[in-house]
């Protein structure tokens, strides 16, 4: 478990990756406490002066013009949490909820939200106790923030809802006892500050970002394996070609392939004078395709890194003037578009990988045995594995349709344009699984192709990558139950071990 002293608004992508992948012990920096207390004091000042301010002593949404009596303000906070906890579907994974909570703590602690330190410390205590609220994954349209998911996240503060602890689903009462906590009463504005924000969609999108980074690394390494297995040329990776175009992602991708393939190998030297003039695009244009994906990954990382440190509830409290201003930072359009870009990148990583599998099993293109198996006819080899890859790649094409272009008005047309960011981000998990499956099959196919090239050896790095999969899956000498092989290759990709083949600075969070 890592220990993080949180200076609000300064989370790095590498820190966020660590939080999303493992448990964290969280401590709020002392320097944040004054801003939190000052902000909460300004909310209390509004009440003391009898002023009417949206979100403090009014209704919400279409009911914003309804003033709430002072005696009903605590009931209002409880009511908004209970009424907005209307999500459906399976519960999010604990890791997602943990990241969502840390992002919410990070935002609230910047001192723009008018929330008391007691409430923030309650959330920190839950994170540190590893007792997480149960949050259904469906029910948010990404404006006015992720209302339903965040309401479910906040139910335990009131002693309501369910919680997850070490794989067990508990009542809020049981979960709070484990954490050594008791329910609290929310003060004016606190319910809205907790529920308003983009932390659910941002957490899901960040998970998608980190998975996309891992799969970019895997796609590069496995793509290099396929170049060697198919006796592809190194010429398309020449730095002069990519410098002439000037696309940064492409230039970096080509440099990575040169690193993975080296200047030459026994395999490459064996076909220097072959009659094939050009390779198919799935080999030759990898820097162009993967480089474009890398550009999208980097752009999404910039957007999501900013959002993770932003303040996205409403209204906001400005300490320098005492102003409390209503705006629209809860609208998750930046998150939705970033997630859409990641979806396109994931789809393309899988799409070009499937084409390389098809190339390897086709003897006319790869000059390898049909379907990568001896005694073809009796053995079908990789025939249906390629069909599986095609099915996964095709499914991703549907998933990649932009979610951010859709909008349905809500709250009696008060909230008349929404982002659909939560679905945009949530579908990235399914797309990750599909792309990972395609790459797992290509990993098996390229290793099989390299075995057929023996005794000729590939580049040092490619040989090392091949050895990783051969520790788990043996040479395919005849037909056998294929499912476990794909599962083993998939499990290897889940470990993200291929990230180690990339130099520093290629991927934003590594």
Curated annotation (Swiss-Prot):
Belongs to the PAL/histidase family. It is an enzyme of class 4 (lyase). Contains an active site 4-methylidene-imidazol-5-one (MIO), which is formed autocatalytically by cyclization and dehydration of residues Ala-Ser-Gly. Pfam families: Lyase_aromatic. It comes from Shewanella sediminis (strain HAW-EB3). This is Histidine ammonia-lyase. The keyword Cell division does not apply. Keywords: Cytoplasm, Histidine metabolism, Lyase. Its EC number is 4.3.1.3. GO terms for cellular component: cytoplasm. GO terms for molecular function: histidine ammonia-lyase activity. Pathway: Amino-acid degradation; L-histidine degradation into L-glutamate; N-formimidoyl-L-glutamate from L-histidine: step 1/3. It is found in: Cytoplasm. Its main location: cytoplasm. HAMAP family: His_ammonia_lyase. The modification 2,3-didehydroalanine (Ser) is found at residue 144.
């Amino acid at each position: 478990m890592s220990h993080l002293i949180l200076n609000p608004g300064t989370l790095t992508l590498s820190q966020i990756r660590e939080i999303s992948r493992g448990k964290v012990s969280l401590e709020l920096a002392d320097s944040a406490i004054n801003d939190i207390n000052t902000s909460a004091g300004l909310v209390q000042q509004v009440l003391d002066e009898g002023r009417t301010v949206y979100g403090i002593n009014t209704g919400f949404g279409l009911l914003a013009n309804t003033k709430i009596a002072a005696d009903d303000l605590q009931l209002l906070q409880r009511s908004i949490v209970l009424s907005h906890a209307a999500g459906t579907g399976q519960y999010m994974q604990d890791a997602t909820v943990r990241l969502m909570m840390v992002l919410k703590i990070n935002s609230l602690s910047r001192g723009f939200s008018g929330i008391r330190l007691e409430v923030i410390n309650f959330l920190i205590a839950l994170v540190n106790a590893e007792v997480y609220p149960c949050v259904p994954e469906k029910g948010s349209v990404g404006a006015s923030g992720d209302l339903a998911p965040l309401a479910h996240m906040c139910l335990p503060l009131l002693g309501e809802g369910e919680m997850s602890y070490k794989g067990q689903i508990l009542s809020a009462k049981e979960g709070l006892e484990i954490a050594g906590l008791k329910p609290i009463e929310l003060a004016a504005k606190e319910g809205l500050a907790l529920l308003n924000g983009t932390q659910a969609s941002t957490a899901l999108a960040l998970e998608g970002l980190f998975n996309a980074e891992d799969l970019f690394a895997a796609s590069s390494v496995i793509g290099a394996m396929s170049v060697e297995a198919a006796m592809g040329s190194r010429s398309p990776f020449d730095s002069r070609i990519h410098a002439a175009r000037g696309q940064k992602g492409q230039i970096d991708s080509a440099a990575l392939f040169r690193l993975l393939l080296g200047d030459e190998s026994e395999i490459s030297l064996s076909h220097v004078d072959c009659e094939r003039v050009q390779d198919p695009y799935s080999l030759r244009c990898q820097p162009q395709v993967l480089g474009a994906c890398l550009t999208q990954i980097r752009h999404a990382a910039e957007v999501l890194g900013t959002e993770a440190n932003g303040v996205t509830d409403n209204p906001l409290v400005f300490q320098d003037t005492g102003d409390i201003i209503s705006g629209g930072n809860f609208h998750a359009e930046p998150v939705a578009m970033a997630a859409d870009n990641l979806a396109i990148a994931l789809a393309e990583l899988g799409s070009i990988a499937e084409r390389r599998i098809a190339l390897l099993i086709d003897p006319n293109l790869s000059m390898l045995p049909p379907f990568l198996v001896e005694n073809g006819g009796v053995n079908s080899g990789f025939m249906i594995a390629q069909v599986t890859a095609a099915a996964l790649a095709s499914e991703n094409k549907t998933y990649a349709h932009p979610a951010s272009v859709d909008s349905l008005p809500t709250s009696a047309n008060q909230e008349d344009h929404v982002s659909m960011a939560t679905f945009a981000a949530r579908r990235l998990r399914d797309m990750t699984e599909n792309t990972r499956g395609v790459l797992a099959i290509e990993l098996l196919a390229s290793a099989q192709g390299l075995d057929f090239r023996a005794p000729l050896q590939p580049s040092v790095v490619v040989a090392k990558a091949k050895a990783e999969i051969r520790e788990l899956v043996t040479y395919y000498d005849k037909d056998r139950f294929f499912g476990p092989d794909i599962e083993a290759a998939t499990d290897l990709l889940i470990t993200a071990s291929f990230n180690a083949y990339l130099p520093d600075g290629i991927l934003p969070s590594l």
